[in-house]
Amino acid sequence: YKTDDVFPSLNTTYKINDQHQVRLSYGRSINRPEFREVSSSVYYDFDLASNVQGNTELKNCYVDNLDLRYEWYPSRGELISLAVFYKHFDSPIEWTYTVAGGTDLIYSYKNAKSANNYGVELDIRKNLGFIGLKDFSWSFNGALIKSKVQFEKGAKEEDRPMQGQSPYLINTGIFYKNEPLKMDIALLYNRIGKRIIGVGRSEGSTGDDSNSRVPHSYEMPRNTIDFSLAKKFGEHLELKLNVRDLLAEKIYYKQFADVTYSDGSKKEVEEIARCYKPGRNIGLQAIYKF
């Protein structure tokens, strides 16, 4: 897996005035397969509750990124940014199903021909002093993404988004910072849209040794809330409390299939492929600086 690559990048900024500017950036990056992804051995993935086998034929994935961004800085520490972006993936690596040991289906890895992602992104950082909350600030990041995988000519796979890509992302948070009390508090919220976690198999798909169709596995939308508190005592001691996933909502992987009944009617049927509750993570840390 020795390759000689060139990764060009370009960043330009047009400053309209002290508060407004426009940025244009381009960059090329690489996603190399991990060792276990190119190994022919089988291992068990506890999150998927399934065996996973590597693929010795995997290739590097090359990503071209293009981003056009408008930025407005209303005041110190504040930002409103709106961006449009485009990403092209050459040979993206995806989770997929394969047949091993007869008819047993397990997860593996496979290169798609290519994929294109494009969308819009909004960033906001705002102090809340204008409503009387001088020690509070608010941040928001949201994106809408359109994703489409390109297949080899003659392939029978249907159009679909790239595995792992959500159609939307939401991250927002409230922050409290009090200098006299030497205290920082953050409450963060995150949500992702429905996304393919495992690529299924179309009937007669190129390279398949079976004509059986397996629906894609989707990770369903889920809300997460994280909390953190940091407090300094004097010049040397600091205590930190972190709570991840306060809501502890269940994680659902679902499959959707079109079923034709004996009377000729069709209906989409959904099945829960996996469901588990990850639980909360609580951490308490004490830091003493000499």
Predicted regions and their residues:
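Gram-negative outer-membrane beta-barrel transporters
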Residues: 84-89, 104-199
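Structural signature of outer-membrane beta-barrel domains
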Residues: 19, 29-33, 75-77, 87-91, ...
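C-terminal beta-signal and adjacent terminal beta-strands/loops
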Residues: 90, 191-206, 230-290
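Residues on the lipid-exposed face of transmembrane beta-strands in outer-membrane beta-barrel proteins
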Residues: 10-14, 68-72, 120-126, 172-176, ...
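Repeated loop/turn-to-beta-strand initiation elements of outer-membrane beta-barrel proteins
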Residues: 19-22, 76-80, 131-136, 180-185, ...
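Outer-membrane beta-barrel translocator domains and adjoining extracellular loop/strand segments
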Residues: 35-41, 48-49, 92-100, 145-158, ...
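Outer-membrane beta-barrel signature, preferentially recognizing the C-terminal barrel domain
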Residues: 30-81, 86-89, 100-127, 163-168, ...
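Signature of Gram-negative outer-membrane beta-barrel scaffolds
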Residues: 1-19, 43
